[in-house]
Structures are given as structure tokens and as C-alpha cells.
Amino acid sequence: MSKKIVSFQGLEGAYSDLVCRKFYKNFITLPCDTFQKTLDVVTNGTAELAIIPVENNIAGRVADMHFLLENIRLKIVAEHYHKIEHHLMAKKGCDLKNLRKVYSHTHAISQCKRNIKKLNLNSFNYMDTAGAAKFVKNNNEQGVSAIASKLASEIYGLKILIENFEDKSENITRFLV
């Protein structure tokens, strides 16, 4: 019997990937470039389930998702709440005093804005948190960092400079299945 597939938007190490791994351990995870593709692979039968974030108690609604949900014919079968723990990370050898830029998803940046300001970093939006971590890994510029999950730091070989970088510790995102 072949394993079932659960899709998510983003790269490996994204928070949606963490939710897939936590609640659907017997499934193969399928990263998708966009929310639309994440849903399309369920519609066309490639995946059995899709995990999508819909709102965060700090950053609010994930606007793209609410628009897409109005136009799909899939059924919501579950919801999961996941505590988001953002970590500030950079390449090995980089330290806090050398940082100038931070990359992450717009929601992650808004959830860490006070800490970003304390470090006097320029923030730049990226498609997803794991994508930002991969970007930092492949970037030769000095002083760049990402805000992403611990899993992303492990996957992309980055050093965590500050754990739990979010401004508020009770940072919860609601995901629909």
C-alpha cells in the first residue's frame, strides 16, 4: 500500500510543513509553490489532504487563503492550532553584531517587528519562512539573516542566533485541512 500525500505551501521547513509532520506522520509531504497549487493537487487526486494557514492571533488573516477558500469545492475535514516559534538564523560564522538584513514571510516579520527594530535590521518580505532560510543559505552577502522554524535551520544548515524571536510568546496559527 502506498503512502498518502499531504500538500502544503512553501518549502520544506515551512510552518505548514511542521504541521503536516506533526499531525500526519504517516503521510508523505508535498511542498507547493502557491496556495492555489496546494489545493489543486488535492482536487486532481495527487494528494489526499492539503494543510493551509488561515489566521494568526497576532498577524491576523492570511488574506490569500480566505479569497481562495471562497472558490474551491473541497471540504474542510479538520483544523489544527500550532504554536509558532520563530528563530533568527544566519550562516555559520555570522553573529548578531554583523547583521544588517532579515528576510522572512510578511506575517513572520510583523510577528517579530519589535525585535527586528531592537537589532536595527532592515526587513525584506519573502514568499515563505523556509524560502527565506534557503535564500540566506545561498546568499553570499554578509550580514543577512532569516526568521524561520528550527526545522528550516536544520534543513538549510543555518545557525540559530536567537531562539523564540517572536514579540509575543503566545503566537498561534490556525491551519485548515
Annotated model-derived regions:
Residues 1-177:
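Domain-level signature for soluble enzymes in the chorismate/prephenate branch of the shikimate pathway
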